[in-house]
From Swiss-Prot:
Record's subunit section: Homodimer.
Source lineage: Bacteria, Pseudomonadati, Pseudomonadota, Gammaproteobacteria, Vibrionales
Cofactor: how and how many bound: Mg(2+). Can also accept Mn(2+).
EC number: 2.7.2.1
Family according to the record: Belongs to the acetokinase family.
Cofactor needs: Mg(2+); Mn(2+)
Annotated substrate binding sites: R90
Residues annotated as signal peptide: none
Species the sequence originates in: Vibrio parahaemolyticus serotype O3:K6 (strain RIMD 2210633)
InterPro entries membership: Ac/propionate_kinase, Aliphatic_acid_kin_short-chain, Aliphatic_acid_kinase_CS, ATPase_NBD
Domain of life: Bacteria
Main location: cytoplasm
Class of this enzyme: transferase
Name of the molecule in the record: Acetate kinase 2
Site (Transition state stabilizer): H179, R240
């Protein structure tokens, strides 16, 4: 073992993902999940050396605090504690305040809490995780890595909304973007695959999972992205609507819908689930399509068409074009969805490598198509956000 391990924590509103990452290799030495926090069946499971274990979480204290407290004993029991040099926290929203990874102090934690209005489901939970980890691991330096940070290089023309200026100056309403850590990682890996310096490489990165976003990366920097002020905008997703005429919200309110009902529908009952009337899972959509389900077929078409439209529009943001990167659970594994997206981009001249597309699944990277017209490639690259968090934490030691 080397003294290069980082405990990476991703604290959700009712869950806690954790991993001990080797910051040199990117390997997850230990990985686990705490879930159902706040409920009677709260539990915590982990995987170490191929063996899985699960325990119940009981007690009157915060379940986040209890779970992170148990990590102290667990890392000692597994012989990992002495090699952990830092704790890295994934924080969803850094606003305009945090443009890069920072070492956590009380002031930083308070600033993260102040940004709760911009990410009410995520930032309060992130701050709870930070406070619990600082108490549990007082001797370890701790760092915050922000999903929004990579997108802080967007030019003003990309992040500015066409709205009254005071909505930005008074309320901070602008495009922030998310999945930044993922887009950052895969763009660096893509540059290595095509043997070019990242500073001279330009890609359109497509992160497709239950949440989904596209990012235009020009000479290694984010210059535009599909998610905006919140993770609700942009692409159609598992249960989220993506881009929508805002007049629809007023229309539904006038029809007697409550604000809560409107936004619950747009966040939790739209996307794949809403269009198909069946499921939010892309695998279920594809299976139902094969059985002739019309709603599933329509959801597939709407989803892939919208991704293709975003890719095509982001060519306007680039000075050159080296390729498209597919990542995220769907992007890394769904051959039919990748194929349909590239098929829609027929004017770009991508020719599928059928074997390459079949092989680039289940954790395997690869080239799945090439455009002789543009000299660009379509790549599949598994994301590794935890490794980025570990690396950026170690860099600040």
């Amino acid at each position: 073992m080397s003294n290069s391990f980082v405990l990476v924590i991703n604290s959700g509103s009712s869950s806690l993902k954790f991993a001990v990452i080797d910051s040199v290799s990117g390997d997850a030495v230990l990985s686990g999940l705490g879930e159902c926090f706040g409920l009677s069946d709260a539990r915590m499971s982990w995987k170490f050396n191929g063996e899985k274990k699960e325990i119940s979480i009981e007690g009157d204290d915060s379940h986040h605090k209890i779970a992170i407290g148990k990590l102290v004993g667990l890392t000692e029991e597994l012989g990992l504690a002495q090699d952990i040099v830092a704790v890295g926290h994934r924080i969803v929203h850094g606003g305009e305040k945090f443009t890069k990874t920072v070492r956590i102090t009380e002031e930083v934690t308070q600033e993260i809490e102040k940004l709760a209005d911009l990410a009410p489901l995520h930032n309060p939970a992130g701050a709870i995780g930070i406070r619990a980890a600082v108490e549990a691991f007082p001797s370890l330096p701790q760092f915050a890595v922000f999903d929004t940070a990579f997108h802080q290089t967007m030019p003003q023309r990309a992040f500015t909304g066409a709205i009254a200026k005071e909505l930005y100056t008074d309320f901070g309403i602008r495009r922030y973007g998310f999945h930044g850590t993922s887009h950052y990682f895969v763009s660096r890996e893509a540059a290595k695959m095509i043997n070019k310096p990242i500073e001279e490489s330009s890609f359109i990165s497509v992160h497709l999972g239950n949440g989904a976003s596209v990012c235009a990366i020009n000479n290694g920097e984010s210059v535009d992205t599909s998610m905006g002020f919140t993770p609700l905008s942009g692409l159609m997703m598992g249960t989220r609507c993506g881009d929508l005429d805002p007049g629809i919200i007023e229309y539904l309110l006038k029809k007697g819908w409550s604000q809560e009902k409107v936004f619950n529908s747009l966040n939790k009952a739209s996307g794949f689930l809403g269009v198909s009337g069946l499921t939010s899972d892309a695998r279920g959509i594809l299976e139902a399509m094969e059985e002739g389900h019309e709603g599933a077929a329509l959801a597939f078409q709407v989803f892939t068409y919208r991704v293709s439209k975003y890719i095509a529009s982001y060519l306007a943001a680039l000075d050159s074009f080296d390729g498209i990167i597919f990542t995220g659970g769907i992007g890394e594994n769904s051959m039919p969805i990748r194929r349909e997206i590239l098929k829609n981009l027929k004017l770009l001249g991508f020719v599928e490598d059928v074997k390459g597309n079949e092989d680039a699944r289940f954790g395997n990277a690869g080239v799945i198509a090439t455009s002789e017209l543009l000299g660009a490639k379509a790549l599949v690259i598994p994301t590794n956000e935890e490794w980025v968090i570990a690396q950026q934490s170690v860099e600040l030691l």
